[in-house]
């Protein structure tokens, strides 16, 4: 599945658990 940057940042935050990964 393709994600927009907005969706991707939310997914990464969920996976990271701390929101330590941020996309522009």
Swiss-Prot record:
This protein's source sits in the domain of life called Eukaryota
Q: Which UniProt keywords apply?
A: Calcium, Glycoprotein, Lactose biosynthesis, Milk protein, Secreted
Q: Output the GO biological process annotations, alphabetical, semicolon-separated.
A: lactose biosynthetic process
Q: Where in the cell is it found?
A: Secreted
Annotated signal peptide? none
Which tissues carry this protein? Mammary gland specific. Secreted in milk.
Instruction: Show the disulfide pairing.
Output: none
Q: What post-translational changes are documented for it?
A: Glycosylated (50% of the proteins).
Gene Ontology CC, one term? extracellular region
Tell me the subunit arrangement. Answer: Lactose synthase (LS) is a heterodimer of a catalytic component, beta1,4-galactosyltransferase (beta4Gal-T1) and a regulatory component, alpha-lactalbumin (LA).
Q: What does this protein do?
A: Regulatory subunit of lactose synthase, changes the substrate specificity of galactosyltransferase in the mammary gland making glucose a good acceptor substrate for this enzyme. This enables LS to synthesize lactose, the major carbohydrate component of milk. In other tissues, galactosyltransferase transfers galactose onto the N-acetylglucosamine of the oligosaccharide chains in glycoproteins.
Say which family it is in: Belongs to the glycosyl hydrolase 22 family.
> What name is this protein filed under?
Alpha-lactalbumin
Annotated source species:
Felis catus (Cat)
Corresponding gene? Answer: LALBA
